[in-house]
Structure formats: C-alpha cells, structure tokens
Amino acid sequence: MLSRRTKTIVVCTLVCMARLNVYVPDELAERARARGLNVSALTQAAISAELENSATDAWLEGLEPRSTGARHDDVLGAIDAARDEFEA
C-alpha cells in the first residue's frame, strides 16, 4: 500500500499462529517478566528444538546397526590424528 501523504510503502504481513496456554511456576514467570524476556519466542524455540531432537532420535533409531570391524580405540586414535593434522 502506498501512503499519499508520506510517499512511503507500507507492508502488512499476516501471520497465523495458534494460541496456547503455558503454565510455569509464579517465581519463574516473575523472573522472566523482570528480565523482559519474550516468553512466546522462548517457548517457540523450545518446542522447535524438541521436535528437531525427536526427529533426529527417530531417524537414528531407524538406522540398522553395522559393524565396521574397527576397534573403538583405533577410531579414537584416527580422530585424534586428524585433529592434529588440521590444527597444524
């Protein structure tokens, strides 16, 4: 939309979001208010992180275990050698 008076463009974006009730202890809510935290953004980030972690866990559980025949100590030694090489 173009404003005739100021000749600037005004953009309006509609975002549909569900409204949820989140219950936290009174003391935690007070501390969040005192710090000026955006509880909505923090809640969104926490839910997103949990969903991503759950998806990763589900993917890992779906993998078939395969033995490479490599011993754990040999793998750790190879990783240490690679780190040393890249740090040099």
UniProtKB/Swiss-Prot annotation:
UniProt superkingdom: Bacteria
InterPro entries: Post-segregation_anti-tox_CcdA
Induction of its expression: Induced during infection of mouse macrophages. Induced in persister cells in response to D-cycloserine.
UniProt GO BP: negative regulation of growth; response to host
Keyword Acetylation: no
Key words, A-Z: Toxin-antitoxin system
Keyword flag Signal: no
Record-linked Pfam families: CcdA
Biological role: Antitoxin component of a type II toxin-antitoxin (TA) system. Upon expression in M.smegmatis neutralizes the effect of cognate toxin VapC3.
Protein name: Antitoxin VapB3
Originating species: Mycobacterium tuberculosis (strain ATCC 25618 / H37Rv)
